[in-house]
Amino acid sequence: MFHKIKNVFPLEDYKLLVQFISGVTKIYDVKPLFEWKEVFKTLKENELFYGVYVDVGGNGIVWNDYVDLSCEELWENGKEISTPFDGLISMSDATTIWGLNESTLRKAISYGKLKNGIDVCKYGKQWVVSIESMIREYGQPSK
């Protein structure tokens, strides 16, 4: 399975908090990479390390043209942590993961398949849906 990245946040002690579109959050320790390849030692410069961002498409993270990591490296070697938002994903991420149209999910809400306030909820302009309810109604993700 391909684990696309939604957000990355640099932390102290050369660690990264990585949020995947599947709703999983992991902590990735960059320090072991300093010994693996010379190019990663440049991350010891705090300005560069703290400039990390998710590449277009969520397939990895990037610091500059020479230093990047794939989403699979972060998934395989990151340590999963729990957060208050575990099990919740945005409706747009759910449509991507399950291969559905957003209108399909909106109809599921209006027909009562997904219950507002229990399975889905709107926060500001953003709808979030529980992964559990998506699996219940649409099965395991196709991707």
PLM feature segments, named:
Residues 1-126, 130-143:
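Motif-centric detector for short Cys/His coordination patterns
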